[in-house]
Amino acid sequence: MSGKGGKAGSAAKASQSRSAKAGLTFPVGRVHRLLRKGNYAQRIGSGAPVYMTAVLEYLAAEILELAGNAARDNKKTRIIPRHLQLAIRNDDELNKLLGNVTIAQGGVLPNIHANLLPKKSAKATKASQEL
């Protein structure tokens, strides 16, 4: 007999979020809701929020990794806005992407113009040539 009933005693499969199905940490459902509520388009496909969530997660991981390296270079264990600024501005692609972004409490990149550096004296150059 073919019917709707399955085997007796078999447990129903637990529901799995779209984030878990895609192997992501960021919430796909929330991104989908924000895309729908934002009036970006009349209709939003099912793959669009998954792809966008994956891109956002990748960018966040990339920035956090570089900021963590900057914090470690400064012998700190906590990432502060200064570390985010250094990480973004020292990376060519992230700097191009976030070129117009101002990071509060980020400071500026250390840079001294070559004309402002002290000139080598004649004595220092002669002494180095003799050795």
Swiss-Prot record:
Belongs to the histone H2A family. Gene3D superfamilies: Histone, subunit A. It comes from the Eukaryota. It holds the Pfam family Histone_H2A_C. The gene is HTA1. The lineage of its organism: Eukaryota, Fungi, Dikarya, Ascomycota, Saccharomycotina. In contrast to vertebrates and insects, its C-terminus is not monoubiquitinated. Phosphorylated to form H2AS128ph (gamma-H2A) in response to DNA double-strand breaks (DSBs) generated by exogenous genotoxic agents and by stalled replication forks. Phosphorylation is dependent on the DNA damage checkpoint kinases MEC1/ATR and TEL1/ATM, spreads on either side of a detected DSB site and may mark the surrounding chromatin for recruitment of proteins required for DNA damage signaling and repair. Sumoylation on Lys-126 may lead to transcriptional repression. Keywords: Acetylation, Chromosome, DNA damage, DNA repair, DNA-binding, Isopeptide bond, Methylation, Nucleosome core, Nucleus, Phosphoprotein, Ubl conjugation. There is a cross-link at residue 126 (Glycyl lysine isopeptide (Lys-Gly) (interchain with G-Cter in SUMO)). It is found in: Nucleus; Chromosome. GO terms for molecular function: DNA binding; protein heterodimerization activity; structural constituent of chromatin. This is Histone H2A.1. The keyword Acyltransferase does not apply. GO terms for cellular component: nucleosome; nucleus. Core component of nucleosome which plays a central role in DNA double strand break (DSB) repair. Nucleosomes wrap and compact DNA into chromatin, limiting DNA accessibility to the cellular machineries which require DNA as a template. Histones thereby play a central role in transcription regulation, DNA repair, DNA replication and chromosomal stability. DNA accessibility is regulated via a complex set of post-translational modifications of histones, also called histone code, and nucleosome remodeling. One of its GO terms (biological process) is DNA repair. The modification Phosphoserine is found at residue 128. A motif ([ST]-Q motif) lies at residues 128-129. CDD domains: HFD_H2A. The nucleosome is a histone octamer containing two molecules each of H2A, H2B, H3 and H4 assembled in one H3-H4 heterotetramer and two H2A-H2B heterodimers. The octamer wraps approximately 147 bp of DNA. Disulfide bonds: none annotated.
